[in-house]
């Protein structure tokens, strides 16, 4: 096992372990992204979660590092059912440059995530939907409609997040 993955192994899912340190290392050595993408496919749920966390942190500043893994994200990793992975995959999907066909696929994935048992996954999916609509205003009406629906049926946290996102989306559509 690669040393980077070893540093993310062990413990339980209540801790991010060395994810922050690993993200810093990968920012300095972007070639190590491939190691994190190997780890996210591990059978170990702790390692999967921490690799997803580190990748998500790296791509806040360097979203272009996701591009070589776009197909894998869309076709395989987005289907991982582990909630701690999903809540990191959602913002990654929103950071990808997407064709119209891929955009449609990502919207469907994220809408599926809004039905997840985890309220964190739901909230992250709502945020990712809004982020995509900010970037592509053509999607504003559809995303606004979905967020309005989620505000009605969601948890208190989803309602609060949804209202905040909806306010920003409404402002965008009037610009």
Where are these regions (language model features)?
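Alpha-helical scaffold domains
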Residues: 1-175
């Amino acid at each position: 096992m690669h040393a980077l993955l070893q540093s993310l192994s062990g413990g339980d899912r209540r801790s991010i372990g060395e994810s922050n340190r690993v993200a810093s290392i990968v920012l300095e050595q972007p070639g190590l992204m491939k190691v994190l993408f190997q780890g996210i496919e591990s059978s170990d749920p702790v390692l999967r979660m921490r690799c997803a966390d580190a990748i998500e942190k790296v791509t806040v500043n360097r979203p272009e590092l996701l591009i070589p893994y776009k197909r894998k994200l869309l076709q395989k990793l987005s289907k991982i059912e582990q909630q701690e992975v999903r809540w990191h995959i959602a913002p990654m999907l929103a950071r990808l440059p997407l064709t119209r066909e891929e955009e449609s696929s990502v919207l469907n994935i994220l809408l599926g995530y809004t039905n997840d048992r985890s309220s964190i996954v739901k909230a992250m999916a709502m945020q990712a939907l809004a982020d995509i609509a900010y970037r592509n205003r053509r999607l504003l009406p559809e995303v606004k409609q979905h967020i309005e629906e989620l505000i009605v049926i969601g948890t208190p946290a989803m309602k609060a997040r949804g209202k905040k996102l909806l306010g920003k989306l409404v402002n965008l559509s009037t610009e």
